[in-house]
A protein has these predicted regions:
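Glycine- and other small-residue-rich loops at beta-strand/loop junctions that grip anionic moieties
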Residues: 5-6
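PLD/PLD-like phosphodiesterase catalytic module centered on the HKD motif
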Residues: 10-121
Length: 121
């Protein structure tokens, strides 16, 4: 599972990522470096749990919001939309999030994640 998200401050989402990692799911997380420096960011929680994490310092703003993961043995699925992984997005904002199970779309998202991951060694 790969996660590219601009802002990650929702403790429940961070906990779910950590639980997946603890179950042996191969997880990598990429966040925006400016947002990661926020006192509310959960980057340090993920780091402490051993989740591979990189902060994007190579683009103006890493404003992506997507997850690519296995869809219970049915191939890859992409979750994407306007939703940042924040409490405000979950509780206050008008946001959207969609699940895509088109394999060619999932491969494109995965390729973009790999490109950004490699840029931010």
């Amino acid at each position: 599972m790969v996660v590219a998200v601009y802002s990650l401050t929702h403790d429940g989402i961070s906990a779910a990522i950590i639980r997946a990692h603890d179950r042996g799911v191969k997880v990598r997380v990429l966040t925006d470096s400016l947002q990661a420096s926020s006192r509310y960011a959960d980057d340090e929680l993920l780091d402490a749990a051993g989740v591979p994490l990189r902060r994007d310092t190579q683009t103006g703003s890493m404003h992506n919001k997507f997850i690519v993961g296995d869809s219970k043995g049915k191939g890859l699925a992409v979750l994407t939309g306007s939703f940042n992984f924040t409490k405000s997005a979950a509780q206050k904002n008008a946001e959207n999030f969609i699940v895509l199970r088109l394999q060619y779309v999932a491969r494109e998202y995965l390729a973009e994640f790999e490109r950004l991951w490699a840029l931010n060694k």
